[in-house]
């Protein structure tokens, strides 16, 4: 990969998405991978994953290769807000790298966990923005003493836009 490293938040989201997928038991990996991923997440050790690389339908191979590199004890990680050698951090935390077994390499790297993890973060922030926008819209409505019929139940129930109905309902509740 190239470019800037993913933020620790994004890297952790990738790890969580990967842990979720691998824990389903359909990827041909050993339980040691799941246990090490869990330990890294809990100890706040995140892999150095670069923002640019192959992301797409066949998987996030480049980014997940950087995660796999950490799992085998290679590459670099972020720990205590510092970029460090994985081997040093593993030694400090008494962690053992995984031993890759036959056919396990593909299971470690093939998937869409990068897109999924970053997508989850974006969805979270998008919802926060919607909430803020709704509150600001309500505040403006109050400040200018506008009519509130544009979000009335009578008007919005005639429209077949579920999202609009929900937002109008939330605005009525806020005011």
Which sequence ranges carry the predicted segments?
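Conserved, well-structured ligand/cofactor-binding cores
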Residues: 1-175
